[in-house]
Structure formats: structure tokens, C-alpha cells
UniProtKB/Swiss-Prot annotation:
InterPro entries according to UniProt: FUR, Fur_C, WH-like_DNA-bd_sf, WH_DNA-bd_sf
Pfam families: FUR
Presence of the UniProt keyword DNA-binding in the record: yes
Coiled coil: none
GO cellular component annotations of the record: cytosol
Transmembrane segments: none
Protein name: Ferric uptake regulation protein
Alphabetical list of PANTHER family matching this protein: FERRIC UPTAKE REGULATION PROTEIN, ZINC UPTAKE REGULATION PROTEIN
């Protein structure tokens, strides 16, 4: 996981907002966070860090390779720690919850399809969208 020293190594000062936002991504039970999610966590912890600062820090972390940005169907950017391991996403259309998964068969099939069509696959992103089917889903909005 990135540390304050890592911030300095990539040319970013280890400021309180940067350290706190980095800590949120390292310790949050939820791996996929929007700027608004981060801001809400900061407010709940009584941190005086504005939403504009959150956006700026998230962009800096993305540019530095600490975070990855995903733009799912909701249209808002969702960030996660860039730990270098490829994975795909399942996205709930009801609440926006994101789950990661890795499936070697899917990865192989994508490579095979690319080769069959004359492509050497360099990178890809797969996001599957659906509705949770669990009756007791804790993430489903109450109706």
C-alpha cells in the first residue's frame, strides 16, 4: 500500500488532506469510492477538507498512478487503489455498489477473441451491470 514516503517519491508533499484521503482508501471497507463518498467520510470524521480539495487530490493520485478511475453507467467517477492486479467489475444498477472479480476463463476468452480478429490485446476493462437478486441485500435502497 502507498505510504507518505511514496507520496514524496512521486513528487507530492505529504499534506494532511493527501494523507487522510490516502488513509481512507487504505482502510475503508468499501474499495470503490466517489469524491462525494470520500468527502462524506471526511465530514463524519470532522475533517475540515473541502470537496474541491478532495477532487484535486483524487486527480493528483490518479495521475500519479496511486488510484484508478472508473466511469460506470452512473456517470460519476469511482476511484480505487491501484494495486496493480487486473480485475473486472460487477455494478449494481439499483444502488451502484461495485464488486470486483477475476475469472481466468473470461480472461482467456477475451485474448482468444482478440487474436481471432487480428488484435494483440494490450489492456481491457470489463464491467457487468445487473440487479442484486438477494432478498436481504444490505445495499439495496429501501422502498
Amino acid at each position: 500500500m502507498p505510504s507518505p514516503a511514496d507520496l514524496k517519491n512521486i513528487g507530492l508533499k505529504a499534506t494532511v488532506p493527501r494523507l487522510k484521503i490516502l488513509e481512507i482508501f487504505q482502510t475503508s471497507e468499501q474499495r470503490h469510492l466517489s469524491a462525494e463518498d470520500v468527502y462524506r467520510i471526511l465530514l463524519n470524521e470532522h475533517m475540515d477538507i473541502g470537496l474541491a480539495t478532495v477532487y484535486r487530490v483524487l486527480t493528483q493520485f490518479e495521475q500519479a498512478g496511486l488510484l484508478s478511475r472508473n466511469n460506470f453507467e452512473s456517470g460519476k467517477a469511482i476511484f480505487e487503489l491501484n494495486e496493480g492486479k487486473h480485475h473486472d467489475h460487477l455494478v449494481c444498477l439499483d444502488c451502484g455498489r461495485v464488486e470486483e472479480f477475476f475469472d481466468a476463463d473470461i480472461e482467456q476468452r477475451q485474448q482468444s477473441i482478440a487474436r481471432e480478429r487480428g488484435f494483440a490485446l494490450q489492456e481491457h476493462a470489463l464491467s457487468l451491470y445487473g440487479n442484486c437478486t438477494k432478498d436481504d441485500c444490505p445495499h439495496r435502497p429501501r422502498r
